[in-house]
UniProtKB/Swiss-Prot annotation:
Catalytic reactions on record: L-lysine + 2-oxoglutarate + O2 = (4R)-4-hydroxy-L-lysine + succinate + CO2
Gene3D superfamilies: Clavaminate synthase-like
Note describing how the cofactor binds: Binds 1 Fe(2+) ion per subunit.
Name assigned to this protein: L-lysine 4-hydroxylase
Organism: Flavobacterium johnsoniae (strain ATCC 17061 / DSM 2064 / JCM 8514 / BCRC 14874 / CCUG 350202 / NBRC 14942 / NCIMB 11054 / UW101) (Cytophaga johnsonae)
High-level lineage: Bacteria, Pseudomonadati, Bacteroidota, Flavobacteriia, Flavobacteriales
Cofactor dependence: Fe(2+)
Family membership noted in the UniProt record: Belongs to the clavaminate synthase family.
Length: 370
């Protein structure tokens, strides 16, 4: 395997670009007026529809998004939905989007299975409006929690602390695009931080941060790579279908990537050529990871899942630093929502009776609905 120094010698370090290579997400400072509008809208929708999964609400979601969201936020998201350009990082941080009532939220549950979704209802409405403005439609995946609804609470679980999952905490969660093992993975993701008292940085990596596609990246268009299921699955399958890591436009590609499962999983079953290519790519990509942002309560990170991978740093759940000492605190709690821009294109993969329920198991294989 080539050394990092040899790799760097082969890649042009300085090129003249007609655009600014994006290395960090756009940060939108939400105004107090916009925050107040969103709070009132969430309460209004909760009163009118009871649940953010109400079919009458979901089927008219795009209309409500453009009617009720603050205009500036709706315009930002609408542009974001079709911007695949060279200078688009693929993630937006809405700083201070919501005021989270910590007393109403109560103590963080032990795990996501114990989450009280009656306390999260208002946040589900607001997150869904953001997706609706793209416009994109909130969906759930059988491959994740056997569905579990369109809003998932992500909570550190002591029993899963060392895993490469959202429930983990004690190890760095390698950057990954959500559900890289699916052909019909989510198009857009939202991460609403209800609390992050441990001050855990969010890690982001954009395929656009490389600048132009180089020789290392060109090899990733070949459909020779294993995309194993993630650490939520117990079985180890190393002879699954193959796929490319980069896809779409050859000059401005999309990415399907999970460093933990494709490179560091000893049972991934990559061929020597595939593993070599992935490792060379990772040596370059890991230097482009952005870990500068520490989310606060009420912040939302909105991600194009075809452009930008996400992860997080390791942390000690329920412990924060204060005056140089670790003291107890409420554990981190986040809400994730996923969406697809078209239900037509995924119909062969969705439940017969619910086009919002994606039944894909692994790179085009569908779970048995019987």
């Amino acid at each position: 395997m080539k050394s990092q120094s040899l790799i760097e010698d082969e890649i042009p370090v300085k090129e003249n670009y007609a655009y600014q290579i994006p290395t960090s997400p756009l940060i939108v400072e939400v105004t107090p007026q916009e925050r107040n509008i969103l709070s009132n809208v969430g309460a209004l929708l909760e009163k009118a529809f009871k649940s953010y999964e109400n079919p009458d609400y979901i089927e008219a979601l795009h209309l409500y998004s453009f009617q009720l969201l603050p205009e500036r936020i709706a315009r930002i998201l609408s542009r974001f939905g079709t911007d695949f350009s060279a200078d688009q990082y693929g993630a937006i941080i809405f700083r201070g989007l919501l005021e989270v009532d910590q007393d109403h939220l109560g103590p963080t549950p032990a795990n996501w299975q114990s989450a009280d979704y009656s306390k999260l209802n208002k946040y589900g409405f607001i997150c869904s409006l953001l997706h609706g403005a793209v416009p994109s439609k909130p969906v759930q995946y059988y491959a994740q929690r056997k569905g579990g609804g369109i809003l998932h609470a992500v909570i550190p679980d002591e029993k899963m602390a060392a895993t490469q999952t959202g429930s983990g905490s004690k190890t760095n969660l390698y950057v990954h695009t959500e559900d890289a093992f699916l052909l019909h993975q989510a198009d857009f993701l939202s991460f609403l931080y209800l609390r992050n008292e441990e001050r855990v940085p969010s890690t982001l990596y954009s395929v656009r941060s490389h600048g132009k596609v180089n020789k290392i990246m060109e090899k990733l268009f070949d459909p020779i790579y294993q995309c194993p299921k993630d650490a939520n699955y117990q079985e180890e399958i190393n002879d699954g279908p193959l796929a490319s890591v980069l896809y779409g436009n050859k000059k401005l590609p999309f990415i399907r990537f999970d460093a933990a499962e494709q490179i560091f999983n000893e049972n991934a079953g990559q061929t020597p050529e595939a593993l070599y290519n992935l490792t060379e790519f990772w040596n370059e990509a890991k230097e482009l990871i952005n870990s500068d942002y520490i989310p606060d309560s009420g912040d939302v990170i909105f991600v194009n899942n075809h452009l930008c991978a996400h992860g997080r740093s390791a942390f000690t759940a329920g412990q924060k630093e204060e005056n140089g000492k670790l003291v107890p605190c409420e554990r981190r709690q986040m809400l994730r929502m996923m969406s697809k821009t078209s239900l037509i294109h995924i119909r062969s993969m969705t439940h017969t009776d619910d086009p919002y329920f994606v039944m894909e198991e692994h790179l085009g294989k569908v779970f048995d609905q019987a």
